[in-house]
Design a protein with these regions (language model features):
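Hydrophobic h-region of N-terminal signal peptides that target proteins for export
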Residues: 11-18
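Low-complexity, acidic/polar, glycine-enriched regions of mature
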Residues: 19-179
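Bacterial N-terminal signal peptides that target proteins for export
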Residues: 1-6
């Protein structure tokens, strides 16, 4: 009798502890940061981010990660200096986490709360707007994260004793698909 009760209990409760209701995979991604100096500005671009979303009970948790050294500005000296300034050897990954309602994929715009780990620091960004476009089973998400150097306690690099501006917006263009 106890064995039957235990078996019934396990059969009823295991699905609640089981796998996700649905999952999303990052298919392609372009991330671009922009820094500006009175004498010039530059952008670093990466196409190597990886990501996954796990949805359960109406909520989706997303994680996106990209190597700091994967950003390319077109100037290898600048890229090496960027890795040094951002402590990329010690903290080689940028990690972004967010939680969204599963129904968010049905809207044209989402406002996401982001947690970003970069250069050994964690910064929170509230209600960052992203545009969504769904075609077939692919969902394209694009927007700009209003990051700053000071958010991550990065000393602004300087050229001719003039530091770059604190603003470091990151343009995001991602394509996701359900797994």
């Amino acid at each position: 009798m106890n064995r039957k009760i235990l078996t019934a209990f396990l059969l009823l409760t295991l699905p609640a502890f089981g796998g996700a209701d649905s999952q999303w995979v990052l298919e392609q991604c372009t991330l671009s940061y922009h820094v500006s100096h009175p004498l010039h500005s530059s952008e670093g671009v990466s196409h190597t981010a990886r990501g996954k979303g796990v949805c359960h009970q109406g909520q989706c948790d997303f994680l996106i990660a990209v190597a700091v050294k994967s950003f390319d500005s077109g100037d290898s000296n600048r890229d090496i200096h960027m890795v040094q300034v951002t402590r990329g050897a010690q903290f080689p990954m940028v990690v972004v986490r967010t939680r969204l309602p599963e129904t968010a994929s049905a809207t044209a715009t989402i406002h996401a709360d982001l947690e970003i780990q970069f250069a050994g620091q964690t910064a929170q960004y509230k209600q960052v707007a992203f545009e969504l476009a769904t075609q077939g089973n692919q969902t394209r998400i694009s927007g700009t994260i209003p990051a700053t150097l000071s958010d991550f306690k990065i000393d602004p690099p300087s050229l001719l004793a003039i530091p770059v501006k604190n603003e470091m917006p990151v343009r995001v263009d991602m394509t996701w698909h359900p797994q």
